Swiss-Prot record:
This is Ferredoxin. One of its GO terms (biological process) is electron transport chain. Pfam families: Fer2. [2Fe-2S] cluster binds at residues 42, 47, 50, 80. Binds 1 [2Fe-2S] cluster. The keyword Metal-binding applies. CDD domains: fer2 (cd00207). It comes from the Bacteria. It comes from Chlorogloeopsis fritschii. One of its GO terms (molecular function) is 2 iron, 2 sulfur cluster binding.
Amino acid sequence: MATYKVTLINDAEGLNQTIEVDDDTYILDAAEEAGLDLPYSCRAGACSTCAGKIKSGTVDQSDQSFLDDDQIEAGYVLTCVAYPTSDCTIETHKEEELY
């Protein structure tokens, strides 16, 4: 099992924290275990409350069913169903940008 460094950032929220996330753990779950309060709703990849935007690195979010190909191509990620596949930086609280 690999462990990656995931940096979660959001200037408006005053968030800039790096956490270690195993490659079989969803980023949202690891953030909560680290004491971070990120937005979420369904926890099943079927809404956009937990949306973030990848600034660097890669994730596996094949369990999600909400984002379309264009949104994924633009770097959007649903943190509740995203596993890290490399060290990555994700800007959080991006739901409003999807619409």
